[in-house]
Amino acid sequence: MALLFGIGYVLIIFEESLSFSKSGIALLMAVSLWVVRSIETSVEIVTLELQHATSEVSQIVFYMLGAMTIVEIIDAHQGFKLVTDCITSRKPKILLWVIGFATFFLSSVLDNLTSTIVMVSLLRRLIPPSEYRKLLGAVVVIAANAGGAWTPIGDVTTTMLWIHGHISTFSTIKNLFLPSAISLVVPLALMSLTSEVHGMGLNTPPTPLLAYDRSAPRGKLVFGVGFGALLFVPLFKSLTGLPPYMGILLGLGVIWILTDVIHYGDLERQHLKLPHALSRIDSQGALFFLGILLSMSSLDAAGILKVIANYLDAHIANVELIASIIGVVSAIIDNVPLVAATMGMYDLSTFPQDSEFWQLISFCAGTGGSMLITGSAAGVIFMSMEKVNFFWYFRKVSGFAFAGFTAGIMTYLAVHNFPL
């Protein structure tokens, strides 16, 4: 099973070179692994294991689909114009910091992918094609990953840990906000000294802001209700004790009815209604997560992940080092299966909820992907939108991202071990 998983994983890593869809590979890998598992063990046992795995995995997939649909309907109503309208500075250094922290806070309540799309689209309105715009785009990637690490709804990996009870809302925000902010501040400070930014104000005249399109009808209302629905999910979980996907489905139902009422009887606004938004969400991404998580659950059921955990415990006793290694590896390998594997390797009896280990896993897996452009969904979409290649990012940005990653870990350990 480990060999089969390894082959599938290599195919996923080189999906662009092979022109294969990683979603298709992940689904084939998941089914193949469970078939092998059924051959090794009785069908009755495997059926129970698969039912348990499907129950856990489906919660994450339902949550993702609900959140992506809400974000898509907000975007269709140009709700993010409220955010982009607030960014008016044209001074290079100020814009660098404004873009960074706007993305940081936006990503804390949205997924990294959507935050990156919104902010890179904004950059296209602010700045003509240049090295400076590429650098700002890289800032968006770092900020999106850092912003997603300190809230349960900001990144799919923190959401996975949260849904499975490894981290809680208040403790995550309290313990990871400062390290996440530091992991952004350090790269911003270093980038401010580069020639692309420092020399920009000396040699280039201010870039005029481009006009925005007029907002869709009731855009502010949809923005408020949609954002409120996303923010309500942690409160819903704490009030009812029900899993987060129920909260996101509640919000989805509310915004569905709202948009039906707003656009009732208007045939020219069908593209603003939720059924059309469902056709635009990243369903391939959801199926990829489904395949990966089912694959990891098969390895967990077979006891393979426990063997790896025992090996790490025997050779690397330091939990901080294990979490840091996972963060570095997440720059090369997708962080979703890494976190899924970690949850399978270590249960809550080994490391209880909100322990240092799970907090560090949340931080490291979230921010580690910034070190390479292919290490996160934010980096991949930036590469696609701005036609940035792997080696440009590696030369210009990876060092800054690594410095921020290291500083963030040191900040967490300092605060955790020496509380004020």
Swiss-Prot record:
Keyword Ion transport: yes
TM regions (residue ranges): 25-45, 60-80, 94-114, 136-156, 173-193, 221-241, 242-262, 285-305, 321-341, 363-383, 400-420
Keyword flag RNA-binding: no
Bilayer topology annotation: Multi-pass membrane protein
Main localization (coarse): membrane
Molecular function per GO: antiporter activity
Any single biological process term in GO: sodium ion transport
Top-level taxon in the UniProt lineage: Eukaryota
Keyword set, alphabetical order: Antiport, Ion transport, Membrane, Sodium, Sodium transport, Transmembrane, Transmembrane helix, Transport
Subcellular location per the Swiss-Prot or TrEMBL entry: Membrane
InterPro entries: Cit_transptr-like_dom, NhaD-like
CC annotations in GO: membrane
Coiled-coil region list: none
Family listed: Belongs to the NhaD Na(+)/H(+) (TC 2.A.62) antiporter family.
PANTHER family: SODIUM/PROTON ANTIPORTER 1-RELATED, SODIUM_PROTON ANTIPORTER 1-RELATED
Role, per record: Na(+)/H(+) antiporter that extrudes sodium in exchange for external protons.
Protein name: Sodium/proton antiporter 2
Species in which this protein is naturally found: Arabidopsis thaliana (Mouse-ear cress)
Gene: NHD2
